UniProtKB/Swiss-Prot annotation:
Protein name: Elongation factor G 2
Protein family (similarity comment): Belongs to the TRAFAC class translation factor GTPase superfamily. Classic translation factor GTPase family. EF-G/EF-2 subfamily.
Gene that encodes it: fusA2
One Gene Ontology MF term: GTPase activity
GO cellular component: cytoplasm
Positions with a binding annotation for GTP: 14-21, 78-82, 132-135
Amino acid sequence: MADLSKYRNIGIFAHVDAGKTTTTERILKLTGQIHKSGDTHDGTSVTDFMDQESERGITIQSAAVSCFWKDHRFNVIDTPGHVDFTVEVYRSLKVLDGGIGVFCGSGGVEPQSETNWRYANESGVARVIFVNKLDRMGADFFRVTNQVQKVLGATPLIMTLPIGREDEFVGVVDVLTKQAYVWDATGLPENYTIEDVPADMVDQVEEYHELLIETAVEQDDELLETYMEGVIPSIEDVKRCIRKGTRDLAFFPTYCGSAYKNKGMQLILDAVVDYLPSPTEVDPQPLMDEEGNENGEFAIVSTDLPFKALAFKIMDDRFGALTFVRIYSGKLNKGDTILNAFTGKTERVGRMVEMQADDRNELASAQAGDIIAIVGMKNVQTGHTLCDPKHPVTLEPMVFPTPVISIAVQPKDKGGNEKMGVAIGKMVAEDPSFQVETDEDSGETILKGMGELHLDIKVDILKRTYGVDLIVGQPQVAYRETITKEIEDSYTHKKQSGGSGQFGKIDYRIKPGEVASGFTFKSSVVGGNVPKEFWPAVEKGFKSMMGTGVLAGFPVLDVEVELFDGGFHAVDSSAIAFEIAAKGAFRQSIPKAGAQLLEPIMKVDVFTPEDHVGDVIGDLNRRRGMMKDQEPGLTGVRIKVDVPLSEMFGYIGSLRTMTSGRGQFSMEFSHYAPCPNNVAEAVIAAEKEKKAAK
């Protein structure tokens, strides 16, 4: 049985193009998993195995890879850097124990770096930092570490220092051991020598060595006291303190190098072994009760406890349906029967595999700490708990963001409907942030996602991977509706048509709810005017209407309803009568309560060369942007701004034109806000026209 203390489940996180996939490739090369490193530059990387990833030079799916370094098992997940695929990062963090944050030596802390860092902090994931691409023009290790402090609010613990700059970057100095690692010009990772610190760096190395020791020993009161008395701690004692501080997120061991040029990578692997936690050293996952609340128990990581695992990713590849799981406790053998706690159904495990990106190794068994894929499971979705049927439990589920953009698609020929339906079913299972519905009036299939690139990739997969020839509509914004004032109202549903009739009268207050509260209901009825048995029917009636607003038919957000009185008939009143009354009350009262149209606001991060700042800001103002921040960088200016999603379609083309191709941007959903009257009127009119045309 494998020693859990020698397991490292880690993710690699970064902004687009910071070099995380190349970093993963070099890790695989050094650990002997591949013999020739691939590159995103030429579309040959091992973890970017989708056609869309190879062509665009970005990571879209989280690819799991297993490898070994110094008797330690690494399960590595290379995650996407583009904000449209943040859900992949989120669900990876859910099952990881540690991570490597990769930052570009010239780009520094970029927008998606902040998002990933925030998610990792929320998940309590310990990390080491790798400042990559120090061979690039404009790379500056210390500028990046300063940004880590200023922008991320994190404390970088500098473990290596660069030898040389830009094209003269030849190696690194290990600050703890005060040894220099110098690579030759062959570009091979193993072609390095360990030397004395260069003469012109001795003072600098000594300064950072002292700072490293001082910061580390603060994690151990006894060691700190002896250090203050002049006793120099051993390297092993310092490493133990660094490990504790890293696990507690007190600081982040920070390394430098060039993944592409194979410089500095061995020290990163050593850092994963020395400082990132094993599965038994992280806070255990909470267990949930039937209502979805924490029950006070935890999924302790141990091979001696009953089997518990979380399905964190579903993927359909050329080998068949794969369910990626993180095993938290117990053991799993081929042929075992396991319970899906969500569905209540059991399944037999036919085949288990260990993933090597696009390849696989068959497994006879797996244990706590492992990240594996089970082949051919049915009715399992992302976030489902798999467990021992004799010991049913539920792990904390995953919560995914709501899509903000949609497009209509339909096959060019009728024969493509079935093919498209099967393909979309598989894609929805793989990506919980990708949703699909059918327009009841037009019969069109509506694809919903997190951004233009997200849906662009999905359409591309439908066309090329599944061979569905599509007609694709224009992107549509996911508007919402809400109310702005509190009213008190009454509604009676009465129907008599021979025999027993229907009767339900409700008196209620309806008012704006808390932001992001959705729908809330309470009853303050005193006495028996509305019997308690009918209260759930009233709630159900109101809630069922939240999906279709009165202004333009968009879903309604944040409404609170209080039932305070009413009336009933001993014979004619029923649950269905009160449900119908609540539906009528909703239609009657929402217009009176100041119905308002809401639009999604995006948090936009724009980078532009300095000489184009005026044009870019002017354009953002015309797009109804609200400026949040503006900060100068080494090669340009970074602008943070909130902009309505409706104003951002096609923005990349405009930005490239304004900046001669040098501008970049990313955006993610921020919040919903009221539409200006002129915008609301146009949207409502367009929706009415669309419905009339159907």
